[in-house]
């Protein structure tokens, strides 16, 4: 069974939608038609996610993050660009590789539309204890991420503060038995991280404007062979038999089109 709205990275576990629901209850606005010229993309469907209009305060935007190259950055450093931010961990076996595959397809479409400098894709770990910059860099090479793709970590307290602000829950849990082997080191895993599957869209002024919660439909997405082999039974089911309520790369592009006021066509992988 795959997750839909409020879904988790480990789909066998209980969903925890309450935190994000509280955020959206405060921030949600009606998804009305765009008042621009004909052909200008309007807000995405309410079926996909929730339109919001919420500032990200300096206390969150300026928290220090570190890229896979070991360079300092922050959410505020990307102001001036539309930011697509996802939570993930490099050792996720069920949904994160699929989210990454969809984001790669979205990145290609954005670049083909001439919007590469206006849109930034970023993934911030929910497993800072293991996801060091060097490990994130290995993940970058594994998935073939473009140079402008942001893979981020931070001290645990910073990661927790950022995701708590956005209403994205996660928690460390025991590893299944028998334990899976780390795709990078080959060593047996000793724990896992349950987490929500969140896709957050920030506009060029740094305001949170749209939220998608749920597992991805990565049919046709470029999932790295090593990560495909790393998927567990639930992950393979998510990849090969996605639930009807999951989001596709084309779905993920609609908030970007709305925020950039540009039509964007999906570019197939390969």
Predicted region positions:
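N-terminal targeting signals for export/organelle localization
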Residues: 1-66, 249-270
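Short active-site neighborhood of thiol/selenol oxidoreductases, capturing the structured segment around
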Residues: 75-103
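Sec/Tat-exported extracytoplasmic proteins
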Residues: 82, 88-89, 107-114, 143-147, ...
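Structural microenvironment flanking redox-active thiols in thiol-disulfide oxidoreductases
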Residues: 100-162
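Thiol/selenol-based redox catalytic cores and closely related redox-interacting motifs
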Residues: 148-234
């Amino acid at each position: 069974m795959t997750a839909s709205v409020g879904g988790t990275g480990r789909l066998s576990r209980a969903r925890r939608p309450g935190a994000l629901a509280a955020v959206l209850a405060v921030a949600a606005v009606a998804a009305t038609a765009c008042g621009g010229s004909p052909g200008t993309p309007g807000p995405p469907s309410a079926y996909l996610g929730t339109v919001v209009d919420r500032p990200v305060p300096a206390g969150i935007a300026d928290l220090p993050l570190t890229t896979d190259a070991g360079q300092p950055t922050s959410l505020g450093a990307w102001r001036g660009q539309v930011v697509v931010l996802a939570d993930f961990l490099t050792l996720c076996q069920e949904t994160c590789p699929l989210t990454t595959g969809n984001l790669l397809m979205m990145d290609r479409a954005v670049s083909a539309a001439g919007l590469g400098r206006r849109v930034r894709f970023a993934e911030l770990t929910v497993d800072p204890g293991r996801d060091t910059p060097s490990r994130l860099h290995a993940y970058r090479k594994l998935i073939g991420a473009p140079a402008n793709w942001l893979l981020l970590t931070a001290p645990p307290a910073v990661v927790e503060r950022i995701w708590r602000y956005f209403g994205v829950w996660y928690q460390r849990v025991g590893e299944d038995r028998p334990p899976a082997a780390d795709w990078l080191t080959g060593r047996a895993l000793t724990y896992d991280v349950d987490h929500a599957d969140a896709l957050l869209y920030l506009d060029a002024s740094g305001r949170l404007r749209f939220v998608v919660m749920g597992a991805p439909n990565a049919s046709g997405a470029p999932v790295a062979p090593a990560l495909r082999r790393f998927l567990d039974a639930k992950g393979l089911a998510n990849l090969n038999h996605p639930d009807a309520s999951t989001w596709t790369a084309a779905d993920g592009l609609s908030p970007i089109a709305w925020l950039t006021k540009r039509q964007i066509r999906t570019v197939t992988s390969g």
